[in-house]
Amino acid sequence: MKQLKYNIENMKHLLLLLSVVLLMGCQNQNRKDGQEKLSESTKPVQEKTFVELGGEKQYVEMTGASEDLPVMLFLHGGPGWPQTPHLRYFNADLTKQMILVSWDQAGCGQSYKHNPNPENLSPESLVNDAHELTQYLKKRFNKEKIFLVGFSYGSVIGMKLAEQYPDDYHTYVGVSQVISVSESWDVSMQWLKEKAQQKNDATALMQLDLIEKKDSTVCATILDCFMSKYELVLKYGGTVYDTAIAKEIEKAETMYEDYKNYDWFEAFNYTSARMDGVAFTTDISDITELKIPVYFLGGRHDWNLPSVVAENHIN
């Protein structure tokens, strides 16, 4: 594996990690829409709007205690699985330190509700849309650069942005960073086999055998194959380690009026079909050098996207 090289100047950006950890926070801050009562001397940012990206209106939510704060663009994963309600629910403290920007990418969330059949929806269009959004944010808040965070498949978009447009960003942070889906798949499958053998789970072992053989009963499509494995990862606690947090995540997805009746899997399946399952074959291991500071945050109990794959990429 080639070594990913980092420009580690401006190490003050390490402070960003203290904020970014809040993105995966484990407790609700109990503030309406993630905001405390603000001082009259500040000009807070609390905007929910549609921005034209790639020729189509897409939903963007910007929240911060002051327009003077640094801007952080959060790229959700899936593709087709928005994080806006989760960011509202878990991340009140972050909006005191930064202007947190949540974008529902084309084909999901409020963007999907506004336009359920976007003309452009591909890995390339997502990167292009994110680049356009970056330019919009820089102009809107008069910033030379912004901070960039990519989560799960959003980390694929993030790495490509950081590689192609380093002058736009202070720092890139990959949360559950995707490097090679096939390598992550192999590590995840090996973990599942060990778990199933330890528990003498004959049913799980049989399902794993069918998945490996790409049997049509579980792998009619590449998405079906992924979901068949995901069910087992979920069963053994390899997605959300703490069951109490799983309940909080479910609560976040249903408590806000604008997402209360949102069909998460309808949009996810739509996006997967439109993108021909490309998310499940992604490999960006050829990105071996970035010109900005980069940080990877991985969960030691994450066996959907095992952190060891990203760790190996930089060692």
Regions found by a protein language model. Name each.
Residues 79-91, 308:
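The serine-hydrolase catalytic nucleophile loop
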Residues 167-215:
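A catalytic-pocket lid/entrance helix-loop region that shapes and gates access to the active site
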Residues 94-113:
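Conserved alpha/beta-hydrolase
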Residues 202-285, 292:
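Alpha/beta-hydrolase
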Residues 69-78:
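Short beta-strand element of the alpha/beta-hydrolase
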Residues 125-145:
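Conserved acidic catalytic loop of the alpha/beta-hydrolase fold
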Residues 303-309:
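Conserved alpha/beta-hydrolase "acid-adjacent" motif
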Residues 290, 296-298:
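Short beta-strand/loop motif that positions the catalytic acidic residue
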